[in-house]
Amino acid sequence: MDKETLSTLEGTAKRIRRGIIEGVYHAKSGHPGGSLSIADILAYLYTKEMHINPQNPKDDTRDRLVLSKGHTAPALYATLAECGFFSPEELKTLRKIDGRLQGHPDMKNIPGVDMTTGSLGLGISAACGMALVGKTEQKDYRVYAVVGDGESEEGQVWEASMFASHYKLSNLCVILDWNGLQIDGPVEKVMNPDRKSVV
């Protein structure tokens, strides 16, 4: 990656982080740590990797993203605003009772959200379903799933991973956000995985 591209991505990630902080500040609640830890990932995916169209968010040929760690919705919202799916001003309505930017992503109400998530561990299964449909119907889209390190302790994550391998879902990309923290504390103290076998 050249320096100019890297500089552009850093600027995008910085604006996404600003959007996260602004939304959580106005909401007076949220999950800023986990949201901030995926800003670089989302900046790269949405501006350099994924084929998306903010003017046609339900385009059948678009790439899809499943934010399995749904509590980090502020990061997804800030990214979608950065890409033009809705105004950045709307980030100030995060978690407001009459707003559409709630604590977890809602695919029915927010343009650019491909899967409603919230319960940890379910995202890879949903992404596998999307990828299998794409493969079966010979569609040319890719599916990305962003998964938290804490939720990787869920059995369903491993079952879905075996499913993806069995069906050779080459159009699926799972990204593990290894920030070392989960709600119960440091991941290594809650359920110490062998990092070498995971990464």
Model-derived features: positions:
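A short, conserved beta-to-alpha structural element at the edge of catalytic cores
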Residues: 166-192
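Short, contiguous strand/loop micro-motifs
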Residues: 7-8, 29, 63, 78, ...
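Conserved small/polar residues in nucleotide/adenosyl-binding loops
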Residues: 198-199
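Structural motif
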Residues: 30-36
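N-terminal hydrophobic or amphipathic helices/low-complexity stretches enriched
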Residues: 1-16
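Cofactor-binding active-site loop characterized by glycine-rich and histidine/acidic residues
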Residues: 20-23, 36-166, 189
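N-terminal capping segment at the start of a domain
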Residues: 13-29, 177-178
